[in-house]
Design a protein with these regions (language model features):
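Active-site-adjacent substrate/metal-binding segments within catalytic domains
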Residues: 1-87, 94-111
Length: 111
């Protein structure tokens, strides 16, 4: 039972200590950040730092399939924000809610 005195992750009822970083876009030009060599560098750096989790910042971007495949292959956990950050959103507008639901369904299924 959660007592509010600690904060940790559990996977299959096992407490896991997370060590990682917040990943923001590494380049002004997204296409350069999506190159396999850049993605390999991200994961090599994370592993060398003994990280076991990377967080994709909600003000950034969704990564390529290769990124998620590498995370899976290397056992790197990904804490993935949806791309809603640093802005007021029109939550009372039906069109915004509808398009947001589409995005969440598509990305959650992909991730």
């Amino acid at each position: 039972m959660y007592d509010g005195k600690s904060f940790y992750f559990e996977i299959n009822d096992i407490p896991i200590y997370m060590k990682g970083a917040n990943q923001v876009p590494l380049d002004y030009y997204p296409s350069r950040m999506m190159e396999k060599s850049e993605i390999d560098w991200i994961f090599t750096s994370a592993i060398e730092a003994n990280y076991n989790m990377l967080r994709i910042w909600g003000g950034g971007m969704y990564m390529t399939e290769y990124y998620y495949e590498m995370a899976d292959k290397l056992g790197m956990l990904i804490w993935h924000d949806m791309m809603f950050s640093c802005k007021f959103y029109p939550f009372k507008q039906e069109a915004f809610i509808e398009t947001s639901l589409i995005e969440v369904r598509e990305q959650a299924g992909r991730l």
